[in-house]
């Protein structure tokens, strides 16, 4: 009788492990509560797209070129630790590569505009931006921007 009772207790646990086994393998990795790198990575993943869009918008508005530029790729990005009182949000630094498009910078659908493919014109720009932002309020402030014509490669 005692043996039967152990089997009855073992069966629900075995069934539970079989049912949850695949889910346990797919769960996110454990992180220490104060792990800054994990926190920064999550913040970058969440807010970087909006900050990149802002930087591109600023570049297009300040550019003397009548054509719009689009992001080719994010070369590097990181979250700065700010100790200045006037910087109340998150401070992102990023190096972006832009390329000239066939569309004007005031056209409606720049996102779907093809890149310009003229070999005699250098249509690639590499820029470094530092942006202070409170993206949850859609507030952005450009702290630094430096651009160079040509590829960063």
Curated annotation (Swiss-Prot):
Single GO cellular component annotation?
Answer: extracellular space
Q: Where in the cell is it found?
A: Secreted
**What GO biological process terms are annotated to this protein in UniProt?**
antimicrobial humoral response
Which SUPFAM superfamilies does the record match to this protein?
Cystatin/monellin
Tell me the keywords, alphabetical order.
Protease inhibitor, Secreted, Signal, Thiol protease inhibitor
InterPro entries named in the record: CST9-like, Cystatin_dom, Cystatin_sf
| Family as reported in the entry's similarity comment | Belongs to the cystatin family.
Q: What name goes with this protein?
A: Cystatin-9
| Gene source species | Bos taurus (Bovine)
């Amino acid at each position: 009788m005692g043996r039967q009772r152990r089997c009855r207790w073992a069966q629900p646990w075995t069934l539970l492990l079989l049912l949850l086994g695949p889910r346990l393998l797919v769960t996110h990795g454990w992180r220490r509560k104060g792990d800054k790198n994990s926190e920064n990575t999550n913040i970058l993943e969440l807010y970087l797209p909006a900050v990149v869009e802002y930087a591109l918008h600023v570049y297009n508005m300040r550019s003397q070129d009548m054509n719009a530029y689009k992001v080719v790729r994010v070369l590097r990005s990181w979250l700065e630790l700010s100790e200045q009182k006037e910087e109340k949000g998150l401070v992102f630094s990023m190096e972006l590569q832009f390329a000239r498009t066939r569309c004007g910078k005031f056209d409606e659908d720049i996102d779907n505009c093809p890149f310009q493919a003229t070999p005699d014109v250098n249509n690639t720009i590499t820029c470094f931006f530092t942006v202070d932002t409170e993206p949850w309020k859609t507030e952005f402030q450009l702290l630094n921007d430096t651009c160079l014509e040509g590829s960063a490669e």
